[in-house]
């Protein structure tokens, strides 16, 4: 075909399109592509016609790039129409229902009315004409009045077999011997305290003398005692040193002096040998002291063990410190000793 005839045919087609009736919606929806060829004018050509026409090598190479670009644009446009997060959609739906005030499925009333009906209220007794407090006065001379219905119900229930068994157990416990009379290990002193005159003589000689010792009953483990010291001016203190490890270790416990118990020491009789002239006069004043020793519970023998073979002993001595010096009462060098003995007699 002649090239000039082809150009004339294209121009007539374009003029007939412009001067004819308006195109239908289907024809308008067909996309047009601006096609530019060498030696021709720029004329928009429908996409359907381009598909039928053979493509040049340059256009064939550029066509895949255009398709990729169009696919990318479609994916971008489609991403804006994706559904939102389900949680956000549920929250929006609940918010819309609350704003619209939809009625409940059962009563047909809004959901907010139920909360208003079920709202708790507080009423006081005085607002209803009642008293805020109820006072009941009881008298010691007044006997409590038990309702007859309660008494009849109490008498209608006889003792059960379990109650009788418990009663028998209580009677058996009541007939048991006194537990204090059961032989058990008790602390006993293994020394003899001096008599009154011998204690006064010891007090004059060493200025301190132990006069009384008492051991507590099991299961307590305590030793208490008292004695006297010759009072002197200035600071003074009394302590008890004791051990239960045969003096491998020992403890010093301070004793308590009683300054209100000051009493003069009786003078020596003239017939006593070795007495001095000043001893015939009234003796110096004395003060009484008290102490308490706490023993560990592991020292006491267990039940069934021989207390004699246990071999545990408590040794102690009394120390008196004053401005004149330090004085000891250690039972004439033998120490005061306590041991566990199985016995039923109290000390």
UniProtKB/Swiss-Prot annotation:
Polar residues bias (residue ranges): 13-22
Induction cue: Up-regulated during fasting and down-regulated after feeding.
Keyword Lyase: no
Parts of the chain that traverse the membrane: none
Modified residues (Phosphoserine): 81
GO biological process annotation, one example: glycogen biosynthetic process
Single GO MF annotation: glycogen binding
Record keywords: Phosphoprotein
Domain named CBM21: residues: 200-339
Highest taxon, organism lineage: Eukaryota
Pfam families: CBM_21 (PF03370)
Record's function text: Glycogen-targeting subunit for protein phosphatase 1 (PP1). Involved in the regulation of hepatic glycogenesis in a manner coupled to the fasting-feeding cycle and distinct from other glycogen-targeting subunits.
Protein name: Protein phosphatase 1 regulatory subunit 3G
Organism in which the protein naturally occurs: Mus musculus (Mouse)
Gene name linked to the record: Ppp1r3g
């Amino acid at each position: 075909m002649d090239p000039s005839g082809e150009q004339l045919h294209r121009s007539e087609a374009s003029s007939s399109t412009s001067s004819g009736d308006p195109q239908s919606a289907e024809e308008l929806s067909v996309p047009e592509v601006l096609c530019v060829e060498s030696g021709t004018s720029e004329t928009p050509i429908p996409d359907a016609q381009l598909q039928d026409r053979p493509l040049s090598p340059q256009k064939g190479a550029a066509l895949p790039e255009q398709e990729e670009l169009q696919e990318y644009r479609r994916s971008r446009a489609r991403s804006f129409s994706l559904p939102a997060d389900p949680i956000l959609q549920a929250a929006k739906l609940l918010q819309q229902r609350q704003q619209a005030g939809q009625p409940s499925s059962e009563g047909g009333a809004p959901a907010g009315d139920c909360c208003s009906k079920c709202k708790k209220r507080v009423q006081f007794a005085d607002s209803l004409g009642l008293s805020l407090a109820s006072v009941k006065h009881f008298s010691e001379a007044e006997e409590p009045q038990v309702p007859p219905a309660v008494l009849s119900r109490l008498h209608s229930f006889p003792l059960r077999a379990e109650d009788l068994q418990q009663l028998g157990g209580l009677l058996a416990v009541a007939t048991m011997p006194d537990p204090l009379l059961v032989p058990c290990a008790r602390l006993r002193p293994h020394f003899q305290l001096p008599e009154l005159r011998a204690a006064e003589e010891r007090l004059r000689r060493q200025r301190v003398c132990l006069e009384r010792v008492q051991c507590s009953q099991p299961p307590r483990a305590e030793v208490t005692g008292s004695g006297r010291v010759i009072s002197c001016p200035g600071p003074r203190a009394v302590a008890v040193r004791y051990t239960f490890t045969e003096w491998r270790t020992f403890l010093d416990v301070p004793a308590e002096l009683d300054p209100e118990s000051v009493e003069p020491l009786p003078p020596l009789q003239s017939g006593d040998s070795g007495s001095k002239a000043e001893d015939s006069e009234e003796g110096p004043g004395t003060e009484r002291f008290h102490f308490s020793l706490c023993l560990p519970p592991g020292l006491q023998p267990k039940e069934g063990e021989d207390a004699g073979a246990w071999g545990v002993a408590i040794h102690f001595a009394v120390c008196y410190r004053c401005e004149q010096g330090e004085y000891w009462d250690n039972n004439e060098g033998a120490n005061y000793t306590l041991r566990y003995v199985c016995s039923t007699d109290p000390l």
